[in-house]
Amino acid sequence: MVRQALGQFGQIDILLSNAGVTRRADIMDLTEADWDRIHRVNAKGVFFCLQRVAREMIPRRSGRIINIASIAGKGYEGTSNAAYAASKGAVISLTKTAAQQLAKHNINVNSVCPGVTRTALSEDNLRVRAQQEGVSVEEMERRRAAVIPLKRANDPEDIAAMVVFLASPGARNITGQSFNVDGGLIPD
């Protein structure tokens, strides 16, 4: 992936690590295989991608690294999977450590922590939950919105807006931060 990007563009100025898998499961139902798969993608993949791209950014003394974490990694009680929450907590910790170590190379590292976001996967999960609870999808959407202080789930564009800002010159002195985009679910 990095070689391909370098071949096509000549350099990498911005890395957006957006990796995430999960499985809706109670903590007592998670298996070692679940844990390993979730951490392999969500934490290990982000780490090694960050490391590889940082090697390209260091000689140029410039770069922006933006990791997509989750409010689950900050202890949001609505999280449905402990392995997922732990993996996203690892991404938040990685962001802070990488920011400290890469600052001397003028590389900014931040993370975005989305809350409930409308995606094909989340909407499929909403339909499954509605069916399991014997209610309409519309009722599940109302329930979901009711717990969010701004009364709406994110659209992907809400996350993208924060990413664009963090990649912009306006964020040149921001590093080591994890920004919630969650409608106020877990204020920091």
Q: Could you describe each region identified by the protein language model?
A:
Residues D26-I27, D34-D36, I65, R144:
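Substrate-binding pocket helix/loop in short-chain dehydrogenase/reductase
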Residues R55, Q100-Q101, R172:
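Alpha-helical segment proximal to the catalytic Tyr-Lys
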Residues G75, R152, V163-V164, T175-D188:
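Short C-terminal tail/terminal secondary-structure segment
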